[in-house]
Amino acid sequence: MIIREQALAHLMKYNKEPFHIEHALTLEGCMRYFAETEGYADEADFWALCGLLHDIDFEIYPEQHCQKAPELLAEIDAPEALVHAVCAHGYGICSDVEPTHPMEKYLFAADELTGIVWAAAKMRPSKSVQDMELKSLKKKFKDKKFAAGCSRDVIAVGAERLGISLDELMEKTLASMRACEESVRTEFTAICGNGGENA
Protein backbone atom coordinates (compact mmCIF):
# COMPACT_ATOMS: atom_id res chain seq x y z
CA MET A 1 0.00 0.00 0.00
CA ILE A 2 1.32 3.43 -0.88
CA ILE A 3 1.94 5.78 2.02
CA ARG A 4 0.46 9.23 2.40
CA GLU A 5 3.79 11.08 1.96
CA GLN A 6 4.36 9.27 -1.33
CA ALA A 7 0.84 10.09 -2.51
CA LEU A 8 1.20 13.78 -1.65
CA ALA A 9 4.54 14.03 -3.45
CA HIS A 10 2.99 12.39 -6.51
CA LEU A 11 0.03 14.76 -6.42
CA MET A 12 2.37 17.75 -6.32
CA LYS A 13 4.46 16.36 -9.16
CA TYR A 14 1.50 16.82 -11.48
CA ASN A 15 -0.42 19.62 -9.76
CA LYS A 16 1.01 23.09 -9.18
CA GLU A 17 -2.10 25.28 -8.98
CA PRO A 18 -2.93 26.17 -5.36
CA PHE A 19 -6.64 25.60 -5.99
CA HIS A 20 -6.06 22.03 -7.13
CA ILE A 21 -3.85 21.25 -4.14
CA GLU A 22 -6.38 22.74 -1.73
CA HIS A 23 -9.17 20.77 -3.35
CA ALA A 24 -7.19 17.52 -3.09
CA LEU A 25 -6.41 18.11 0.58
CA THR A 26 -10.06 18.91 1.21
CA LEU A 27 -11.32 15.73 -0.43
CA GLU A 28 -8.72 13.76 1.50
CA GLY A 29 -10.06 15.12 4.78
CA CYS A 30 -13.68 14.67 3.79
CA MET A 31 -13.16 11.09 2.69
CA ARG A 32 -11.41 10.23 5.96
CA TYR A 33 -14.38 11.71 7.84
CA PHE A 34 -16.88 9.72 5.76
CA ALA A 35 -14.98 6.48 6.39
CA GLU A 36 -14.85 7.13 10.12
CA THR A 37 -18.54 8.03 10.41
CA GLU A 38 -20.04 5.53 7.98
CA GLY A 39 -18.66 2.34 9.48
CA TYR A 40 -15.41 2.05 7.53
CA ALA A 41 -12.94 3.42 10.10
CA ASP A 42 -10.52 0.58 9.40
CA GLU A 43 -10.34 1.78 5.78
CA ALA A 44 -10.00 5.50 6.60
CA ASP A 45 -6.43 5.81 5.32
CA PHE A 46 -7.40 4.26 2.00
CA TRP A 47 -10.51 6.42 1.61
CA ALA A 48 -8.35 9.47 2.35
CA LEU A 49 -5.77 8.50 -0.28
CA CYS A 50 -8.52 8.17 -2.87
CA GLY A 51 -9.65 11.69 -2.03
CA LEU A 52 -6.12 13.07 -2.17
CA LEU A 53 -5.35 11.56 -5.58
CA HIS A 54 -8.76 11.76 -7.24
CA ASP A 55 -7.78 14.60 -9.61
CA ILE A 56 -4.19 13.50 -10.20
CA ASP A 57 -4.44 13.99 -13.98
CA PHE A 58 -6.77 17.00 -14.16
CA GLU A 59 -4.25 19.84 -14.24
CA ILE A 60 -2.03 18.51 -17.00
CA TYR A 61 -4.62 16.49 -18.92
CA PRO A 62 -7.91 18.39 -18.46
CA GLU A 63 -9.30 17.04 -21.73
CA GLN A 64 -8.41 13.47 -20.74
CA HIS A 65 -9.45 13.66 -17.10
CA CYS A 66 -9.82 10.19 -15.56
CA GLN A 67 -8.36 8.70 -18.74
CA LYS A 68 -4.74 9.44 -17.89
CA ALA A 69 -5.10 8.74 -14.18
CA PRO A 70 -4.34 4.98 -14.42
CA GLU A 71 -1.08 5.75 -16.21
CA LEU A 72 0.01 8.31 -13.61
CA LEU A 73 -1.06 6.16 -10.68
CA ALA A 74 0.86 3.19 -12.08
CA GLU A 75 4.04 5.17 -11.45
CA ILE A 76 3.54 4.67 -7.70
CA ASP A 77 2.09 1.17 -8.00
CA ALA A 78 -1.31 2.32 -6.77
CA PRO A 79 -3.64 -0.61 -6.04
CA GLU A 80 -6.39 -1.37 -8.51
CA ALA A 81 -9.09 -0.37 -6.01
CA LEU A 82 -7.61 3.14 -5.79
CA VAL A 83 -7.35 3.45 -9.56
CA HIS A 84 -10.95 2.30 -9.93
CA ALA A 85 -12.15 4.85 -7.39
CA VAL A 86 -10.27 7.70 -9.06
CA CYS A 87 -11.71 6.81 -12.46
CA ALA A 88 -15.20 6.26 -11.05
CA HIS A 89 -15.47 9.78 -9.64
CA GLY A 90 -15.82 11.04 -13.22
CA TYR A 91 -18.56 8.56 -14.14
CA GLY A 92 -20.94 9.84 -16.78
CA ILE A 93 -18.79 12.90 -17.46
CA CYS A 94 -15.34 11.76 -18.48
CA SER A 95 -15.35 8.10 -17.49
CA ASP A 96 -17.45 4.99 -17.98
CA VAL A 97 -16.17 3.42 -14.75
CA GLU A 98 -19.15 3.23 -12.42
CA PRO A 99 -18.89 3.97 -8.69
CA THR A 100 -20.06 0.85 -6.85
CA HIS A 101 -18.36 0.79 -3.43
CA PRO A 102 -19.69 3.21 -0.77
CA MET A 103 -16.30 4.95 -0.80
CA GLU A 104 -16.57 5.56 -4.54
CA LYS A 105 -20.10 6.85 -4.16
CA TYR A 106 -19.04 9.35 -1.50
CA LEU A 107 -16.13 10.52 -3.63
CA PHE A 108 -18.42 10.95 -6.63
CA ALA A 109 -21.02 12.84 -4.60
CA ALA A 110 -18.74 15.08 -2.54
CA ASP A 111 -16.27 16.13 -5.23
CA GLU A 112 -18.44 18.82 -6.83
CA LEU A 113 -20.23 19.74 -3.61
CA THR A 114 -17.05 20.62 -1.74
CA GLY A 115 -16.32 23.12 -4.50
CA ILE A 116 -19.58 24.93 -3.81
CA VAL A 117 -19.01 24.84 -0.06
CA TRP A 118 -15.49 26.28 -0.30
CA ALA A 119 -16.59 28.99 -2.71
CA ALA A 120 -19.38 29.95 -0.32
CA ALA A 121 -17.08 29.85 2.71
CA LYS A 122 -14.58 32.20 1.13
CA MET A 123 -17.30 34.82 0.67
CA ARG A 124 -18.21 34.76 4.36
CA PRO A 125 -16.67 37.24 6.84
CA SER A 126 -15.19 34.28 8.71
CA LYS A 127 -13.76 32.72 5.52
CA SER A 128 -14.76 29.46 7.19
CA VAL A 129 -17.25 26.60 7.01
CA GLN A 130 -17.47 26.46 10.80
CA ASP A 131 -20.38 28.91 10.95
CA MET A 132 -22.03 27.91 7.68
CA GLU A 133 -25.54 26.50 8.04
CA LEU A 134 -27.42 24.20 5.72
CA LYS A 135 -29.88 26.90 4.66
CA SER A 136 -27.01 29.11 3.51
CA LEU A 137 -25.50 26.29 1.46
CA LYS A 138 -28.87 25.42 -0.06
CA LYS A 139 -29.29 29.03 -1.18
CA LYS A 140 -25.92 28.94 -2.95
CA PHE A 141 -26.72 25.53 -4.41
CA LYS A 142 -29.92 26.83 -5.98
CA ASP A 143 -28.09 29.78 -7.56
CA LYS A 144 -26.63 28.05 -10.59
CA LYS A 145 -24.54 31.11 -11.44
CA PHE A 146 -22.66 30.66 -8.16
CA ALA A 147 -19.68 28.31 -8.54
CA ALA A 148 -21.13 27.53 -11.95
CA GLY A 149 -18.42 24.99 -12.71
CA CYS A 150 -19.72 22.68 -9.99
CA SER A 151 -22.41 20.44 -11.45
CA ARG A 152 -25.60 20.38 -9.42
CA ASP A 153 -26.82 17.44 -11.47
CA VAL A 154 -23.79 15.33 -10.54
CA ILE A 155 -24.28 16.19 -6.86
CA ALA A 156 -27.95 15.19 -7.04
CA VAL A 157 -27.08 11.91 -8.75
CA GLY A 158 -24.43 11.33 -6.09
CA ALA A 159 -26.97 11.68 -3.30
CA GLU A 160 -29.31 9.31 -5.11
CA ARG A 161 -26.56 6.71 -5.52
CA LEU A 162 -25.86 6.90 -1.80
CA GLY A 163 -29.55 6.48 -1.05
CA ILE A 164 -29.75 9.72 0.91
CA SER A 165 -31.47 13.05 0.38
CA LEU A 166 -29.66 16.03 -1.08
CA ASP A 167 -30.07 17.82 2.26
CA GLU A 168 -28.45 14.89 4.07
CA LEU A 169 -25.53 14.87 1.64
CA MET A 170 -25.07 18.59 2.21
CA GLU A 171 -25.17 18.15 5.99
CA LYS A 172 -22.65 15.31 5.88
CA THR A 173 -20.35 17.25 3.57
CA LEU A 174 -20.53 20.37 5.73
CA ALA A 175 -19.71 18.26 8.79
CA SER A 176 -16.77 16.64 7.02
CA MET A 177 -15.39 20.00 5.94
CA ARG A 178 -15.78 21.48 9.41
CA ALA A 179 -13.85 18.51 10.78
CA CYS A 180 -10.90 18.87 8.40
CA GLU A 181 -10.84 22.62 7.74
CA GLU A 182 -8.10 23.51 10.22
CA SER A 183 -5.76 20.71 9.17
CA VAL A 184 -6.35 21.44 5.48
CA ARG A 185 -5.66 25.14 5.97
CA THR A 186 -2.49 24.46 7.96
CA GLU A 187 -1.03 22.05 5.43
CA PHE A 188 -2.16 24.11 2.44
CA THR A 189 -0.42 27.20 3.86
CA ALA A 190 2.73 25.17 4.51
CA ILE A 191 2.73 23.95 0.91
CA CYS A 192 1.56 27.03 -0.98
CA GLY A 193 2.17 29.87 1.47
CA ASN A 194 -0.27 32.66 2.20
CA GLY A 195 -0.19 33.64 -1.45
CA GLY A 196 -2.40 30.69 -2.28
CA GLU A 197 -4.94 31.47 0.41
CA ASN A 198 -7.50 33.03 -1.89
CA ALA A 199 -6.71 30.97 -4.95
Feature locations, PLM:
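Hydrophobic alpha-helical packing residues
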Residues: 31-34, 69, 177
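Acidic/His-rich, divalent-metal-binding segments that scaffold phosphate/diphosphate chemistry
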Residues: 1-61
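Conserved active-site and cofactor/substrate-binding residues in soluble primary-metabolism enzymes
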Residues: 2, 22-26, 64, 81, ...
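Divalent metal-dependent catalytic cores for phosphoryl transfer on phosphate-bearing substrates
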Residues: 40-146, 156
